[in-house]
Amino acid sequence: KGMPKSTNPSGIGYVDYVLWGKDGKPLAVVEAKRTMADARKGRHQAELYADCLETMHAQRPVIFYTNGFESFIWDDTFYTDREIQGFYTQDEIQLLIDRRTTRKDLRTFKVNKDIAGRDYQLEAIKRVAENLVIDGKDGTLRGAKRESLLVMATGSGKTRTAAAIVDMLTKCNWAKRV
């Protein structure tokens, strides 16, 4: 219930699949299109279903849409959509939802100077943090880009810089394993 009348005059829509959590709340909504159709055609429809489920259960589900050959994930509270090679497990989806509230701002992280303490290393780590996170329109934390590229000379401490970035990502709850 709760579909826009412009989309469906009855206000009732039928989602293809809802993946439920152990707490009875929706973890994910899956919109499945025919194999001959572009999977992206299901994006808007899946978003509408997610809106309805969020209203009904007070938890925004992660959005998946697929045609059987291409599959996409979209955690629209944090990142833009991206193609994936397979579906996530129940625990993996629950972790994505849990991270919405437990993630810390990378830009305020104090780097362990025992790992990477040179000024240019600290500047590189700061730039990576700024590249990965932005402030949402509503003041919440949002993901910006999912990747960063550092170009550093031989002997400048690339490994230590990378280790400090991994330390930052894990301690701020952005990554579990690297």
Q: Each PLM stretch: what is its role?
A:
Residues 1-177:
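ATP-dependent helicase/translocase motor core
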